[in-house]
Every structure is written in structure tokens, then in C-alpha cells.
């Protein structure tokens, strides 16, 4: 922002008054200094205010009722209001408007325009094309922009002569000529009403059409009376070969009476039978509603409706909504007075609105670009604009020309609704059919002017005889086709031989290469050994075998691998994006020059091109495979130690390769550390060159690169459209500087900056300040840092060439030349030392992981079974004569689950079974599995323990029952957890079942019986079968057993069972079981009182949590 002339003059006046006051009234020096301080602060106060920009809206608002219907003041106020709310605009200026009246007489209109000089900063208008040139020259002299929607003269588009003139709509003549070209209507007639504004419009239109080489037969003016109109129509009929009649007057659809009488009399004279096409001119200046907008004037006037069949209405295309819908929506939103009827408002309202928005958009662009708001700057920054206007999309091209779309409307002479037939695309100046054909009177279009060539600046005139011209053209075409066909046949044969046959063939297929999929282990030598085996097989004449052992190579296809074997060597395939490549011949003919150039590149530091793979719809560059992979991979491997000597060797290799490419006039365009590969001898080679050239030659599209991919791209290429794909020599030098930063710090580009890749790219695009990586002097010699800064200079012309870089870099190693052999030996020595430490470290890690794995395996399977599975042996099922099984579950678990959240149920089971697992660790038992709330344990297997299995299970059961007596649920501490336990002794068979997640399972009737003992037990009770009690009694260890009586076991009948209630010497407290009813049973769930108490406490806690 700058200090404007008005505030500055006021400050000077204030300073002069202060000086006089100091002289007349003896103003002291201290007081005068205070005045000076105030004077210094005034600009700062002014600095924070937005400058006013007043837009003068010029038109014949008072002398022409049709223009007054456009409601210019309402349109301007609405536009200014919306601009003030649009936060995308620059706020340095605030917009105001003033409605300036234009006299209907052109001479007086120019005089009034001159009087408006001081009333506005820029003008929307004039509406009268008659003084557009004069107004534009005055605007240039006043440095005030002229933004017109009505000016016709194409010379106004010359920005050198009229630098402050802009069109807010496409030139109406361009639109007319585009339509006339399409239908080949060259001969035109122009007629206007007798208002001065339309007379001058007609003269300007005729002159503009003639400048395009189109003959304008008549230019007529007619009054509203029938006699005057009939005279004009007779003159048109007498003129030679007129096809199209352009009517410069107010449209009949919005109440233009002159046009209505003109069309009615033309219909009476049979001139609307298809001989002529009538085109209203004024609708080119606004968007005439047509979707769901029937016109009553056509409905009520049958003669006009029939005549309108010969009229083509060309108007600005509306998109999401019509003018009427947009106006009604604004009225409903309170933006304009609701009392206004949209159908009584001229659609020119939207054009005025769009023109003001146009100025605001240009102003915002100019301020964002250079902070200047001069008239010429606004015109320059009205290019490549796009915004949604009142009800249509407003667009301009790179020259500032409007490219908004138009639509051709038509009726069939019977209906009173307009239909869209063609879209006029002003960007391509072509017509697009919309699916509804034009209904021409008589069923066929108006005859075309076949002898006119529509050449710019050439007069349309007669040519040679059409029949003779057709015969000559046909003969020439036939001869040309014959010669081309023969040449194409010969060339096709030659190309076919060169492409796929012979030792110098370029295109390879699946018959030439064998795809492989290497899996790299921890040792680099594993891949090398396999590669020598493959190469030896290929060289001996045998096909390489792809049934490689695990960890070496596995079969692959072109779809999932980039590595293949070609002529015994490993090769790398750089795949192109999927696309329509055509056949082999079309590829060769369209990009043969690039192919040959890339094939001929031979240098030690350039990865050689071996050919191009093309098969099964895939196209790829085939180059040598480098075993050390890319420079980026080496830099990211912390295990590899790189001293400065070795880093400088890699950089010098890169410089040599790029120097060679630039000498061959070859721009890389994609240079980055991952496109620099290192072979087995630690020689760096540049690869992926020519990729962009082939994309351009084959016209292939590519996905937009990510911000991370653009970190190597020069700023000027980031800012230029298409620059990223094309590249430049200076851009390659910038990319080399970023690679230097990577090598010096062994980090990604801009890794020292605490910004995302997108933020870095945004700063690179929009300097100042110039944004670059910061490299500490400790990473490289000072002269290398200085060279890097020269290479990434903001001005491309200030960057050195690779010849200059090479001359500087080769002497950086303290005056000695870089010796790659010494660097390799030193690096190999470091690598050997690092490898020993790495092996030792990896061995220790492997041993720790092995112990963890074995521990986990023994927790899942018995140790003996786990050892057998580790050795690869089959685990045979094993029978055990006597084992004791333990089953338990939670009483009322279903009720507890229904009253708990799922995570609370998981916490309950985890806490309880963790407690059980701790107990069974002190007993000779084996935990078989847990299913839900069921817990299964066995003793006597997989390791036999004689008769101790019953005692071990009994002791464990007492311990578990004792611990459960004091166990509390975290979420329901008031509710007791009761379990029931069942024990049974008998024979079982054990074995491993399944291959995926193998399990050690028990089988036999003993398992079912033990489960029945648990399910028929009671809470806080250990239910024991007779077989278990018998063994316990033989052990004589003091187990206390009570007879329960005969119990019904499902599937077993009635058997005598017992309760295990204690053991001599067992002092741990056992929970008191619930009393047994008269039927000998208790409830197998929570008591109703317990459930009610828990629900009550839960509701109380919920109320406490919800209380504010």
C-alpha cells in the first residue's frame, strides 16, 4: 500500500498552517516539536486504512427505459455488498460505486463522459459503442480502467494502444463469427432501430464483420412504423445472397416493439421461411433465461411465435441457475428489495453485477502480485481469471479475452419456450451439439456460402468452379494416398526389422527377458551368489531355473517386478504410466529420435540404455541393474560409514554424468538422489534420463507428483505451468545442489527445516525471502558449501554450468584429485569393521528373540510336543491309562455378562484366570484350555506321575477355591464370584490337532464325565467322582471327603459322587457354600437380592457421575 495523493496534500496544508501559527503567535520550539511528532504519526494512522476505489457505472439509465430496467444501482449495490463479504479478496481497497448517466446521443454522451473524470477511479461501460475508442484513450490518459461489456471494435483488444481497456464478456463479434463459420453463413445484413446507440452499434458490427472478411450487404436503420420497416425489408430482399440478418435493437422477448414489428412484417413477406436467419444482437450482452422460462410475448402473439422459428437467439450460458432464479434467491435472502419482480428486470442486471465483480477480481490479483492498482495493472491481471458471477461462470484466457460459454436458443414456431441446441465454446471457438437440433423453417438449414473461406483479413469472394475443384482435389488426394501408402508399407517393413530383430533391436518383449523377484537377506552376498548361478546357466545355454530356495529368488511376472534377466545380466525396468501406446510401429515412428538419442548415450557415469520393453500393454525403459541400488539408499543406511573423500567421489561421478548429458543437449528434468544408482564398484551413474521426453513424445499423462517428489525441482519450474515436466539445464543444476545437501548431511532435502514438504514448496514458489536448506560448516569444506549455494541461486542465469562445477570440484580435495580406489579401500575397511559389529549385534538379538519364541511356544504346548514340532517330527497321539481332569466355571456368568460391558467381562476373566494360572504353577498339572468361563486342567499328562495326579488336582482345587473366596470383580466388587469345580479320573488320549495354530487336545469319555461333574456341581463346592476318591483314599494324605449321594449325570445315568471339603494340614480359608435346599440343590445363578442390590448401587453411581 502507498500513501495516496489526497492524504499527502492534506498533510502539507497542515504543515503550512502550523508554520504560520508558529510565526504569528510565538509558538515555542517544544510545542512545535509536538506538532512535528503528530505530523509523523498521521501517515501511520493512514497506513492501516483501506483506500477507496469508486466504480462508475455508465449507461443511458434515464433516457432509455429498457436500460433503466437493468436497475444498475441495485446491481452495483449487490455486487459491492458481496465483494465486501468475500474474504478471498485483498482488503487494501474498499469498493464504492456511483451511477453515471450517459446521454442517448453519442456526441453528448462523450461530453458527459469527460465530465465524469473526477467522479470515479474506474468505469463499467460505456454502453454506447460509438465512443468506446475515445473513452478508452481518455481512460489511458487518466490512468483509469475502462471495463466494457458493449464495445465492439476489435482494435480495442490491442493492449499496446489501449492498455487500460478490458472486456468483461467475450467480444460479441467473435461469438457471431464462430457461429457463422460453423454454419458457413458469410453474407450478412445489419439492421438497427433509430435510437442513436443502436445506429452506432450497427455501424460498429458491420465494420467488425468486414474486418473478418465477411461481406455485409446492407446496413440499415428503421423506425417503429410499418412503412419504414417494410422499406428496410425490401432492401434486404434486393441485396445479393444475404443469409443472416443481425438485428441491433431491443429484443422482442423483453418487450422490444421495433423488433416485434420487424419480425411480424418479415413473416408477412414470407422472409421467415428459412431463406434468412434472424439473430438478435442485444441478447449477446447478457444471459437470457430459457430454462423453465416460457415467454408470454410468444404465447400471446401467434404471428410472432411463428416468425420466431427463423430466429436464432445467441446468449450467455447460465449454469446452475437462470437469471430469474438468481434474482429471486437474492431477494429472498434480503440482499435486494423483495418488492422487485424478477420478470420485470432486464437480464442486463447480471452483466453489470459481473463487471463490478470482474474489477474486484482483477484488483485482488494485481495487489497479490505486485501491490499496484493502476489501471494498466488491473488490465494485465484480468488474464486467466475464473469466477462465478451472478448466474454464470466468467472466464478469461491468457490474453485477457473472455472465454465464457454461449448457448444457441431456438423454437419450433409452435411453442413459446426456448430450447438450448448448441453450446458456443469461446475457448476453442467451436460449437458443441447439445442433443436438440435446430428447427429450421422448411426442415433444412439456411443455405451455406460454400465459396467463402472465412480467412482473417481476406474478402469473401468467388473461387474456381466447384465441380472442377472437386475433381482436381480428388485426383491429387488419390495420388498422395498412393504414394503415402507405398512409403508407409516400406517404412513399416523397415521399422519392424529394426525394432524386434537383429543385434541392435530397441524394443524387447517377454521372449527376451525373464522377470525375477529378489528377496534380500541380511547379507548382500546372498543375492550375488544367486545371480552368478543364474548368469552361468544362461551363458551355458540353459534356461535359468526360477525354483529358487527361500530367501534368494522367487518367480515373478512383469506385473509385480521391476528386475529381469536380459542376455545373462540383471536389468532394471523403469515403467511408464498405463496408457494407450498403440502398436510397436506407432511407438517407433512417434519417438524414434528420442529412442536413438538415448541408445547412443555412452559414459562411465551414465547408466546405459539397453532398450525398451513393450509387451502385454506395458512400456518401460530397460537399463543396467546396479547392485548397490540408489544413492538415496546408501545415504539412509546408517551402518555404512561415509567419509568426505568417498562423498566427494560420488558427487564427482554425478557431475561427470550430468556434464556429459548437457554436452549432448539432453535435459534430465527428474534429477534426484533416487535417480542416481551405484554399481558394485561404487561408481555412481545417472539414470531415468529421457523419461520426460518420452512422456511428451507419446503424449502420456502422469499423476501429479507429490510435494516430496518436488523438493528437488527448481523454483522457477515450480512456478511455470508445465515446467516440472519439461525441465531445464539450470533446473538440473539446482537439483544437483539439493543432492549435494543430501550427501553432506546424509538426510532428506530440507531435513533440517521443521516444515512439511507442502510448506517448503509453498515457500519456494513465493519468495522473498529465498528459502533454502541450511548446512552447517562441519559437514563439508567451505568451498563446497559455497559451490552448493551458487548452484541453487534464485536467478537461473546465475547458476554455474556443469563444466564450471567440474572445474571447481575436482580440486576441492586439498589440491589433490579424488582417488576412487583409495576411497573404496578405505570404505571397504570401514564396511568390514561395521559388518563384524553388526553380525555380533544381530546374533545377540537373534538369541534373545529365540528365547522369547521358545518361552512362548512352551506356554502354548507341552515342552516335549513343542520340541517335536520344532524338529519337524510328527506328534503321534498318545494314550494315558489314568489321569485326573479338573473343570470349573463361574456360577451366574450369563447374568454377570448381561449386567456388564464387554470390556468389563474381559477384565473379569483376565483377572480370574491370571489368579488361576499363578496357582497351577506350584502344582504338577498341565493347563489344557479355557473356553469362555470354563477352565480345564489335567494332571498325569503329558508327563506321567504315577498316582499323584489325583492329589495334585485335589490340592490345586482347594487352593483355587480358597483364592476365589476373596476374589473381587473390579466393576462389581459387591457381587461374589462363585465357581463350581468337578474332578474325575480315567483314561484319555492326547495329541496335536491341526497345522494352523496347533492345539494339544484330550479325547475320551473321561473328558465328558469330568465336564458333567462340573455342570452338576454346586457353588463353592468341589464335586468329585468315585474313581478320584478311590485314588485319594489310597494315598492316605488326609483328604476330607463327604458323600453327596447318587447324582444324575447326563448320558451316564445315576452315580455315587462326593464333595471334597478339605485336607489334613490345609489351613487356608475356604468360602462357605450356599445352603442346600430340601431337594439337595441350590440356584445356579446370582440370587435376586444380589442382582437388585447391584442394580441399585449402579444407578446411584450413574447419578453421581451425571451430577454437574
Swiss-Prot record:
Extracellular side residue ranges read 51-465
Q: How is it modified after translation?
A: There are 9 conserved cysteine residues in sensory guanylate cyclases, 6 in the extracellular domain, which may be involved in intra- or interchain disulfide bonds.
Question: Could you state a single Gene Ontology molecular function term?
Answer: ATP binding
List, for all copies, the residue spans of the domain called Protein kinase.
532-812
Q: Which residues cross the membrane?
A: 466-490
Cytoplasmic side: which ranges? 491-1108
First and last residue of the signal peptide = 1-50
Q: What does the UniProt keyword field contain?
A: Cell projection, cGMP biosynthesis, Disulfide bond, GTP-binding, Lyase, Membrane, Nucleotide-binding, Sensory transduction, Signal, Transmembrane, Transmembrane helix, Vision
Q: Please provide one cellular component term from the Gene Ontology annotations of this protein.
A: rod photoreceptor outer segment
Q: Which GO terms describe its biological process?
A: cGMP biosynthetic process; cGMP-mediated signaling; detection of light stimulus involved in visual perception; receptor guanylyl cyclase signaling pathway
- Which class of enzymes does this protein belong to? lyase
What membrane topology does the UniProt entry give?
A: Single-pass type I membrane protein
List the catalytic activities from the record.
GTP = 3',5'-cyclic GMP + diphosphate
Task: Classify the source by domain of life.
Answer: Eukaryota
Activity regulation text: Activated by GUCA1B when free calcium ions concentration is low, and inhibited by GUCA1B when free calcium ions concentration is high. Inhibited by RD3.
Note the Pfam families from the entry.
ANF_receptor (PF01094), Guanylate_cyc (PF00211), HNOBA (PF07701), PK_Tyr_Ser-Thr (PF07714)
What EC number(s) would the UniProt record show?
A: 4.6.1.2
Notes concerning its domains: The protein kinase domain is predicted to be catalytically inactive.
Report the sequence similarity comment from the record: Belongs to the adenylyl cyclase class-4/guanylyl cyclase family.
| Identification of the protein by name | Retinal guanylyl cyclase 2
Source species taxonomy: Eukaryota, Metazoa, Chordata, Craniata, Vertebrata
**Gene name as annotated:** Gucy2f
Amino acid at each position: 500500500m502507498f500513501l495516496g495523493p489526497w492524504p499527502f496534500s492534506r498533510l502539507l496544508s497542515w504543515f503550512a498552517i502550523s508554520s504560520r501559527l508558529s510565526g504569528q503567535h510565538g509558538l515555542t520550539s517544544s510545542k512545535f516539536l509536538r506538532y512535528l511528532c503528530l505530523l509523523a504519526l498521521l501517515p501511520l494512522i493512514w497506513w492501516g486504512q483501506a483506500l477507496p476505489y469508486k466504480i462508475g457505472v455508465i449507461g443511458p439509465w434515464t433516457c432509455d427505459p429498457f436500460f433503466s430496467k437493468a436497475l444498475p444501482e441495485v446491481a452495483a449495490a449487490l455486487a459491492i455488498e458481496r465483494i465486501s463479504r468475500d474474504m478471498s479478496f485483498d482488503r487494501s481497497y474498499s469498493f464504492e460505486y456511483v451511477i453515471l448517466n450517459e446521454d442517448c446521443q453519442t456526441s453528448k454522451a462523450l461530453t458527459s463522459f469527460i465530465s465524469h473524470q473526477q467522479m470515479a477511479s474506474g468505469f463499467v461501460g460505456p454502453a454506447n459503442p460509438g465512443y468506446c475508442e475515445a473513452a478508452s484513450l481518455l481512460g489511458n490518459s487518466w490512468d483509469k480502467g475502462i471495463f466494457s461489456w458493449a464495445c465492439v471494435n476489435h482494435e480495442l483488444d490491442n493492449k499496446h494502444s489501449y492498455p487500460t481497456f478490458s472486456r468483461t464478456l467475450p467480444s460479441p463479434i467473435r461469438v457471431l463469427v464462430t457461429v457463422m463459420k460453423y454454419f458457413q453463413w458469410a453474407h450478412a445484413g445489419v439492421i438497427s432501430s433509430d435510437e442513436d446507440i443502436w445506429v452506432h452499434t450497427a455501424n460498429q458490427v458491420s465494420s467488425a464483420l468486414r474486418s473478418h472478411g465477411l461481406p455485409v450487404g446492407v446496413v440499415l436503420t428503421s423506425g417503429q412504423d410499418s412503412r419504414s420497416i417494410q422499406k428496410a425489408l425490401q432492401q434486404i430482399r434486393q441485396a445479393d445472397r444475404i443469409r443472416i440478418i443481425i438485428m441491433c435493437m431491443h429484443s422482442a422477448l423483453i418487450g422490444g416493439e421495433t423488433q416485434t414489428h420487424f419480425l411480424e412484417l418479415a413473416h408477412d413477406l414470407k422472409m421467415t421461411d428459412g431463406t434468412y436467419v434472424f439473430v438478435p444482437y442485444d441478447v449477446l450482452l447478457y444471459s437470457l433465461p430459457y430454462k423453465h422460462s416460457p415467454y408470454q410475448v410468444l404465447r400471446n402473439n401467434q404471428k410472432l411465435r411463428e416468425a420466431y422459428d427463423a430466429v436464432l437467439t445467441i446468449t450467455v450460458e447460465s449454469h446452475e441457475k437462470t437469471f430469474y432464479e438468481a434474482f429471486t434467491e437474492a431477494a429472498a435472502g434480503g440482499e435486494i428489495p423483495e418488492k422487485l419482480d424478477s420478470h420485470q428486470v432486464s437480464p442486463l442486471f447480471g452483466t453489470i453485477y459481473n463487471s463490478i465483480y470482474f474489477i474486484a477480481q482483477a484488483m485482488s490479483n494485481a495487489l497479490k502480485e505486485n501491490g499496484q492498482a493502476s489501471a494498466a495493472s488491473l488490465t494485465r491481471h484480468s488474464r486467466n481469471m475464473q469466477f462465478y458471477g451472478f448466474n454464470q461462470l466468467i472466464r478469461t484466457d491468457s490474453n485477457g479475452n473472455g472465454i465464457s460459454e454461449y448457448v444457441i436458443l431456438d423454437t419450433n414456431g409452435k411453442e413459446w419456450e426456448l430450447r438450448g441446441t448448441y453450446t458456443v465454446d469461446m475457448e476453442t471457438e467451436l460449437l458443441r451439439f447439445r442433443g436438440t437440433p435446430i428447427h429450421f423453417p422448411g426442415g433444412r438449414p439456411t443455405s451455406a456460402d460454400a465459396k467463402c473461406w472465412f480467412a482473417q483479413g481476406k474478402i469473401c469472394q468467388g473461387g474456381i468452379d466447384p465441380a472442377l475443384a472437386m475433381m482436381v482435389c480428388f485426383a491429387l488426394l488419390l495420388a498422395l494416398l498412393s504414394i503415402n501408402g507405398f512409403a508407409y508399407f516400406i517404412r513399416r517393413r523397415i521399422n519392424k526389422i529394426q525394432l524386434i530383430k537383429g543385434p541392435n533391436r530397441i524394443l524387447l518383449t517377454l521372449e527376451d527377458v525373464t522377470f525375477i523377484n529378489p528377496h534380500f537377506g541380511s547379507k548382500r552376498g546372498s543375492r550375488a551368489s544367486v545371480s552368478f548361478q543364474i548368469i552361468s546357466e544362461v551363458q551355458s545355454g540353459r534356461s535359468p531355473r526360477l525354483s529358487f530356495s527361500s530367501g534368494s529368488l522367487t518367480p515373478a511376472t512383469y506385473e509385480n517386478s521391476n528386475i529381469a534377466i536380459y542376455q545373462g545380466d540383471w536389468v532394471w525396468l523403469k515403467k511408464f504410466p498405463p496408457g494407450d501406446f498403440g502398436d510397436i510401429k506407432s511407438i517407433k515412428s512417434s519417438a524414434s529420435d528420442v529412442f536413438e538419442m538415448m541408445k547412443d548415450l555412452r559414459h562411465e557415469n551414465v547408466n546405459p540404455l539397453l532398450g525398451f520393453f513393450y509387451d502385454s500393454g506395458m512400456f518401460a525403459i530397460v537399463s543396467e541393474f546396479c547392485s548397490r541400488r540408489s544413492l538415496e539408499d546408501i545415504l539412509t543406511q546408517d551402518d555404512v560409514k561415509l567419509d568426505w573423500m568417498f562423498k566427494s567421489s560420488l558427487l564427482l561421478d554425478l557431475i561427470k554424468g550430468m556434464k556429459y548429458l548437457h554436452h549432448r543437449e539432453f535435459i534430465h528434468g527428474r534429477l534426484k538422489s533416487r535417480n542416481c544408482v551405484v554399481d558394485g564398484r561404487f561408481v555412481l551413474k545417472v539414470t531415468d534420463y529421457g523419461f520426460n521426453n518420452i512422456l511428451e513424445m507419446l503424449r502420456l499423462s502422469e499423476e501429479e507428483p507429490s510435494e516430496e517428489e518436488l523438493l528437488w525441482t527448481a523454483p522457477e519450474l515450480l512456478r511455470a505451468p508445465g515446467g516440472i515436466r519439461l525441465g531445464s539445464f539450470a533446473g538440473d543444476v539446482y537439483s544437483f545442489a539439493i543432492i549435494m545437501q543430501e550427501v553432506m548431511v546424509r538426510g532428506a532435502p530440507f531435513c533440517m527445516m521443521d516444515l512439511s514438504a507442502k510448506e517448503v514448496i509453498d515457500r519456494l514458489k513465493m519468495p522473498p525471502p529465498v528459502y533454502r536448506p541450511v548446512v552447517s560448516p562441519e559437514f563439508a569444506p567451505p568451498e563446497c558449501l559455497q559451490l552448493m549455494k551458487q548452484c541453487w541461486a534464485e536467478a537461473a542465469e546465475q547458476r554455474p554450468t556443469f563444466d564450471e562445477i567440474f572445474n571447481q570440484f575436482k580440486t576441492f580435495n586439498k589440491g589433490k584429485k579424488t582417488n576412487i580406489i583409495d576411497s573404496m579401500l578405505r570404505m571397504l575397511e570401514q564396511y568390514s569393521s561395521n559388518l563384524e559389529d553388526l553380525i555380533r549385534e544381530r546374533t545377540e538379538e537373534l538369541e534373545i528373540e529365540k528365547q522369547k519364541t521358545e518361552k512362548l511356544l512352551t506356554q502354548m504346548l507341552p515342552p516335549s510336543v513343542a520340541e517335536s514340532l520344532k524338529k519337524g517330527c510328527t506328534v503321534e497321539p498318545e494314550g494315558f491309562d489314568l489321569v485326573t481332569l479338573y473343570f470349573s466355571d463361574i456360577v451366574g456368568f450369563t447374568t454377570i455378562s448381561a449386567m456388564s460391558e464387554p470390556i468389563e467381562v474381559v477384565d473379569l476373566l483376565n483377572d480370574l484366570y491370571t489368579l488361576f494360572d499363578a496357582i497351577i504353577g506350584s502344582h504338577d498339572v498341565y493347563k489344557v484350555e479355557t473356553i469362555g468361563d470354563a477352565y480345564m486342567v489335567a494332571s498325569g499328562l503329558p508327563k506321567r506321575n504315577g498316582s499323584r495326579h489325583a492329589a495334585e488336582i485335589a490340592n490345586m482345587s482347594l487352593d483355587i477355591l480358597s483364592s476365589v473366596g476373596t476374589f473381587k470383580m473390579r466393576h462389581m466388587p459387591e457381587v461374589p464370584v462363585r465357581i463350581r469345580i468337578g474332578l474325575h479320573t480315567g483314561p484319555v488320549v492326547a495329541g496335536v490337532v491341526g497345522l494352523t495354530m496347533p492345539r494339544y487336545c484330550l479325547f475320551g469319555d473321561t473328558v465328558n464325565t469330568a465336564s458333567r461333574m462340573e455342570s452338576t456341581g454346586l457353588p463353592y463346592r468341589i464335586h468329585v467322582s468315585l474313581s478320584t476318591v478311590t485314588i485319594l483314599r489310597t494315598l492316605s494324605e488326609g483328604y476330607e471327603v463327604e458323600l453327596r449321594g447318587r447324582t444324575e449325570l447326563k448320558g451316564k445315568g445315576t452315580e455315587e459322587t462326593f464333595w471334597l471339603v478339605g485336607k489334613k494340614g490345609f489351613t487356608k480359608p475356604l468360602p462357605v457354600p450356599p445352603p442346600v435346599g430340601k431337594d439337595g440343590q441350590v440356584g445356579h445363578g446370582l440370587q435376586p437380592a444380589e442382582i437388585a442390590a447391584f442394580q441399585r448401587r449402579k444407578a446411584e453411581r450413574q447419578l453421581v457421575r451425571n451430577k454437574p
